[in-house]
Amino acid sequence: MPEVKVPELAESITEGTIAEWLKNVGDSVEKGEAILELETDKVNVEVVSEEEGVLQEQLASEGDTVEVGQVIATVGEGSGNASSSKEESSDQSQSANNDEATKELAQPTESQSNNEETQSNPNNQRVNATPSARRHARENGVDLSTVSGKGNDVVRKDDVENSQKAAQSQSSQETSKKEEPKKSSGAPNKPVIREKMSRRKKTAAKKLLEVSNNTAMLTTFNEVDMTNVMELRKRKKEQFIKDHDGTKLGFMSFFTKAAVAALKKYPEVNAEIDGDDMITKQYYDIGVAVSTDDGLLVPFVRDCDKKNFAELERAIADLAVKARDKKLGLDDMVNGSFTITNGGVFGSMMSTPIINGNQAAILGMHSIITRPIAIDKDTIENRPMMYIALSYDHRIIDGKEAVGFLKTIKELIESPEDLLLES
């Protein structure tokens, strides 16, 4: 019987968590059709069936951790149910759903049984429920043993939702009986909230700690007078939009261009250590940190040295949209050479960014703040200033090169016409 395995995703990804089954047991499956969503350390990916037929078994449950190459489902011959997803299945036909759920529960796998036991009643009697019902109950803290199922006594998602609404209504009428907040063991009289970290959050925490422990990280600072680049941007803004189909000229393209020039001048900043070797990259794939609901993601703009300002702005904007819409692919997230992060969008005046992955350095941008600057010994003017930071691995980059790199960034941003001429 054809098997569905966790596919090879990227060199650094060895496992993932099943976020959601998109197909129920008994559903028809087309070749190349997604049957589940897998959460990895970097992005969520859909796992597809390589065969046409009927989903016979789910060999892991939502929330289970599965490894690359592990068999997670089987597909057999037949036409199956007409519905193509869990939500469509629940919406189209009450009787079809009940038959579908009965099929699934008639052949439970070991991992499914374990999952169901966690949602059983005090007498350890298994609750018959569809995957979407189990998931909704788990995410919202609903005890399935308290939910009554319609038709065939199978609990469906709408049964859980109705039970949840009824419980909330009852709770609002009995405010005097509110449950006390969960207490921590260290401070028994203080309220806390305890929740499980997402896979991506756990991975980020692990990797950040690894970087701190395994690199000789230092940070050097400089300041940039943003007067000229702001005036140039203001002067070119409208014409740039007309010439490039609505693409706006932002600061990030200037800093990306400056970073490419500085990386060419100081190639060790574009390097990494591999065992006893140092690998100096001859390409310029620069990561741009994007804040999302799932935390900070760093997709990479490829071949920045070959892109003009408009192409850079479009690429950066497209990656930001994909990141916030959770549509980034693994190809967007791996094999970068350098990273830029902008804490200034959140109001940060100065920070020490942490190096990303196996890279040698990261550039930090910050808020633009108008403050008095001594132009010469007799003149003080208010200028829009930005602090910039370069965190770097001292095992690869000497202090002289780090300072020189950041000074090059400063000089190019303060003379932005040079960047335009280069591109």
Swiss-Prot record:
Residues 153-162 have a biased composition (Basic and acidic residues). GO terms for biological process: L-lysine catabolic process to acetyl-CoA via saccharopine; tricarboxylic acid cycle. Residues 163-174 have a biased composition (Low complexity). The keyword Zinc does not apply. This is Dihydrolipoyllysine-residue succinyltransferase component of 2-oxoglutarate dehydrogenase complex. It is an enzyme of class 2 (transferase). The keyword ATP-binding does not apply. Pathway: Amino-acid degradation; L-lysine degradation via saccharopine pathway; glutaryl-CoA from L-lysine: step 6/6. InterPro entries: 2-oxoA_DH_lipoyl-BS (IPR003016), 2-oxoacid_dehydrogenase (IPR050537), 2-oxoacid_DH_actylTfrase (IPR001078), Biotin_lipoyl (IPR000089), CAT-like_dom_sf (IPR023213), E3-bd_dom_sf (IPR036625), PSBD (IPR004167), Single_hybrid_motif (IPR011053).
